[in-house]
Amino acid sequence: QMCIRDRFYLKHPEFEPDQPFDYSFSKLLSPLNIPPKNCGVGTDILIYDTDGISYPCHLFLPIVHGQNEVERILKDIDFHDDASLINDKCRKCLISNICRTCYGYNQIDRGNPQNRNLSKCKMQLAEAQVISSFQIQYYIAKKEHLTANEVLKLKAAIKCYELVHNNVFNFN
């Protein structure tokens, strides 16, 4: 299915690609020591329970963890500090700036919002390879008519492609 869609967009560059081909790799253009949080948990998102008490996300509600456990969990998490939401292994990853995770499921499944599901690393890497390769082809096909934003997207896709094709990733 994805091959059909990417061939369509390559034959018809007048159409804007949609998901997943429109993924932005622009965060890779800025060297960041600490990757930015990839969702609004605790900062841009608030969820309210039936008593009007706010929580950082629906996965941190008392109905999920129990009231006492939620209070214990939340007192140890600073959702405004991106560095506190990534572990050392992920911090060293070359594409951590574009890695997506769910901090709520990290807490539920692995006991800490920092502890990402490392079984997804290979999938995220494969996705980055395929999408960056597509974007390079797509933007080069319409190179005479690129906007400034599209030039930026092309540069970011090239950066991603170079990172994922020229490096060895340790999944252990």
Regions found by a protein language model. Name each.
Residues 2-4:
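Short, small-residue-biased leader/transition segments that mark boundaries at the very start
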Residues 7-16:
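Secondary-structure boundary elements
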Residues 13, 27, 59, 142-143, ...:
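Generic alpha-helical secondary structure signal
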Residues 16-20, 148-149:
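Short, flexible loop/turn segments with low-complexity composition
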Residues 20-126:
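Accessory C-terminal segments flanking Radical SAM cores
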Residues 88-172:
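Radical SAM enzyme core and accessory elements
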